[in-house]
């Protein structure tokens, strides 16, 4: 396999007036993501989630993210020209956008804390707060302790992102230090 990098960021959907639910607009699911060139699209709670085909280089990584986001925008515009995606960490959703049972699904898979080795508590839908996040996927063949890789990512990615992301609401649900989901590829 060699070393590869991928990601699955989430974005909110908006119309001309406000942030809306992406349920029924995006298509695709965790079990059956919608294939597009360079990756996938799917609904995740009220958000749109993109996934990219794992990249071998930094250039490939950037190109694939840009490509899939462009296809998401085209898809949204084909439904309604006022629809677009918006990159922000959290939003308080109107009740009307939380009617679907899918809007109450949080944390499809358990995640763990690399520092403690313990499973993190699964977020519960207690308010209308929804948060956008995502994961960096790192694939490798090396016999390296996954938790040590995650700890290194905390230092190289996590600490700088704390300076960039000033949204305290998102941190209430996701994105704590050392959070990861074990995968067979790394």
Per-region residue spans from a language model:
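Phosphate/nucleotide-binding catalytic core
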Residues: 1-186
């Amino acid at each position: 396999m060699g070393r590869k990098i991928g990601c699955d960021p989430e974005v909110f959907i908006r119309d001309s007036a406000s942030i809306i639910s992406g349920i029924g607009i995006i298509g695709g699911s965790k079990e059956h993501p919608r294939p597009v060139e360079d990756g996938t699209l799917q609904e995740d709670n009220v958000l749109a989630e993109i996934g990219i085909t794992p990249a071998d280089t930094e250039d490939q990584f950037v190109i694939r993210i840009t490509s899939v986001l462009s296809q998401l925008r085209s898809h949204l515009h084909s439904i309604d020209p006022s629809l677009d995606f918006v990159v922000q960490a959290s939003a308080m959703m109107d009740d009307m956008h939380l009617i679907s049972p899918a809007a109450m699904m949080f944390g499809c898979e358990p995640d763990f804390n690399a520092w403690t080795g313990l499973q993190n508590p699964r977020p519960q839908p207690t308010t209308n707060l929804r948060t956008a996040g995502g994961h960096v996927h790192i694939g490798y063949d090396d016999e390296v302790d996954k938790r040590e890789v995650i700890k290194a990512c905390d230092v190289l990615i996590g600490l700088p992102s704390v300076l960039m992301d000033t949204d305290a609401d998102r941190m209430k649900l996701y994105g704590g230090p050392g959070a990861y989901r074990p995968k067979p590829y790394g």
